[in-house]
């Protein structure tokens, strides 16, 4: 079993996984929004940490069913939303705002027999209102989390049908396979996760790129208006799953260099991520 190896790093007192010393090779995947995004020149450099992105099967049949985008490219799965621009902008922020020794590129991870997920301490899932975990994937994700892993999920909206999908119900259907015996709860404002680096007692909705077209900060109608910071905890009270519902942090990181996207939204999205990452590495 791979487990964490704790050590102090400056004032943060972070922890790293010994498995990172034998990091898996970096690989790029086709994406919905970006057909060709530049790779940083230092992408092969060795570092202690990076954030992994979950490649999951979805309700439309990916990866088994072949579908096509409007431009004729094969549909690469909802898991690629905002990828890789969002990931690399975020990792630049980790380098600037923390002392975490991070790579400049993300790591895409699949829940499969390779057990690669156990090499990466932080896992991110986007558009989880469309995922569809099988029994094997749910079991491996559960084991990953109970061993000390941290899963942050983002960019799903509302409780009523949105483009024909009840995203909250779809999310919880798969999550209940992962943890049938654990409840989803709201994170209180005084929880340590909101105060590891930045004090984030006061928070607001972080909108996605839909704002550029609609001028709205929410999606999915009335039930998408209120942002929810929720979680699932382990037996010791540690947050294992951080659930960002009715917000789109991924778009905030992705468009943080876009003048039309308000600085206050991008700033909060980065601060939430920095707090969540340092919480995980110190708990």
What feature does the model see in each segment?
Residues 21-122, 128-129, 248-251, 255-283:
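Aromatic-Pro/Gly-enriched surface loop or interdomain linker
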Residues 9-21:
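Hydrophobic h-region of N-terminal signal peptides that target proteins for export
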Residues 25-35, 59, 63-66, 158-255, ...:
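An acidic, glycine-rich "communication" segment
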Residues 1-10:
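Bacterial N-terminal signal peptides that target proteins for export
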């Amino acid at each position: 079993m791979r487990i964490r190896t704790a050590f102090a790093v400056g004032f943060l007192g972070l922890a790293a996984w010994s498995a990172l010393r034998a990091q898996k090779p970096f690989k790029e995947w086709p994406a919905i929004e970006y057909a060709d995004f530049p790779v940083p020149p230092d992408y092969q450099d060795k570092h202690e940490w990076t954030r992994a992105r979950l490649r999951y099967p979805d309700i439309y049949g990916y990866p088994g069913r072949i579908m096509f985008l409007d431009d004729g490219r094969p549909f690469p799965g909802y898991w690629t939303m905002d990828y890789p621009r969002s990931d690399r902008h975020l990792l630049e922020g980790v380098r600037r705002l923390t002392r975490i020794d991070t790579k400049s590129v993300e790591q895409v991870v699949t829940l499969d027999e390779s057990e690669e997920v156990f090499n990466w301490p932080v896992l991110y899932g986007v558009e989880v209102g469309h995922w569809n975990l099988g029994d094997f994937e749910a079991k491996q994700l559960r084991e990953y989390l109970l061993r000390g892993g941290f899963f942050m999920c983002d960019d799903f909206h509302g409780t009523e049908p949105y483009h024909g999908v009840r995203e909250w119900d779809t999310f919880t259907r798969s999550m209940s396979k992962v943890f049938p015996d654990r409840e989803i709860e709201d994170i209180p404002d005084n929880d340590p996760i909101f105060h590891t680096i930045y004090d984030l007692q006061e928070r607001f909705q972080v909108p996605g790129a839909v704002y550029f077209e609609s001028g709205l900060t929410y999606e999915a109608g009335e039930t998408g208006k209120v942002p929810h910071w929720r979680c699932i905890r382990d037996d010791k009270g540690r947050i294992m799953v951080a659930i960002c519902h009715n917000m789109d942090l991924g778009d905030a990181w992705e468009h943080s260099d876009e003048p039309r996207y308000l600085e206050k939204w991008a700033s909060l999205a980065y601060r939430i991520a920095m707090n969540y990452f340092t919480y995980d590495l110190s708990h």
